Curated annotation (Swiss-Prot):
Function per UniProt: Involved in transcription antitermination. Required for transcription of ribosomal RNA (rRNA) genes. Binds specifically to the boxA antiterminator sequence of the ribosomal RNA (rrn) operons.
Protein encoded by which gene: nusB
Protein's UniProt name: Transcription antitermination protein NusB
Entry keywords, A to Z: RNA-binding, Transcription, Transcription antitermination, Transcription regulation
Organism this protein belongs to: Desulfotalea psychrophila (strain LSv54 / DSM 12343)
Gene Ontology CC, one term: cytosol
CDD domains per the UniProt record, alphabetical: Terminator_NusB (cd00619)
Family: Belongs to the NusB family.
InterPro entries, per database record: NusB-like_sf, NusB_fam, NusB_RsmB_TIM44
Length: 141
């Protein structure tokens, strides 16, 4: 597994966990400390930590804009109706598509689909692919 795939999975797991912590508005230092604790508990590979932390910090910093983009792309779906795992995977990939110039949109989408196959329900890979393809189109406008 590539370092970036591992980092994306760690970011997904951290953000999933973060969904269940009420009002976890961390300072950058607190976020890094909480992420380091997460990495120790779940034995996250040191090589992927920097990229994972960048993904997490980016998603949390721009979550409202990311969520609006996902809701616009996921026609007839509110964020509250999307499973927590799918929702956070969409957030990570949407952040990469919209804000990471070094990651082609097609790579972010493919990685998200592959991660969905591993962590999400049977229908999730198709759903994730469709939503992210629409996100890519919206970001190109």
């Amino acid at each position: 597994m590539s370092i970036r795939r591992f980092a994306r999975e760690a970011a997904l797991q951290f953000l999933y966990q973060d969904d269940f912590i009420p009002e976890s508005a961390d300072t950058p230092g607190e976020l890094k400390e909480r992420f380091e604790q997460f990495c120790e508990i779940y034995q996250v590979n040191k090589k992927g930590r920097t990229y994972a932390l960048n993904l997490i910090a980016g998603v949390l910093a721009d979550q409202e804009a990311i969520d609006r983009l996902i809701e616009e792309a996921a026609v007839n779906w509110r964020m509250s109706r999307i499973s927590a795992t799918d929702r956070n995977l969409l957030r990570v990939a949407t952040f990469e598509i919209n804000f990471c110039d070094d990651v082609p949109a097609e790579v972010a989408i493919n990685e998200a689909v592959e991660i969905a196959k591993r962590f999400c329900g049977d229908e999730s890979p198709k759903f994730v692919n469709g939503v992210l393809d629409a996100v890519k189109t919206l970001c190109q406008k």
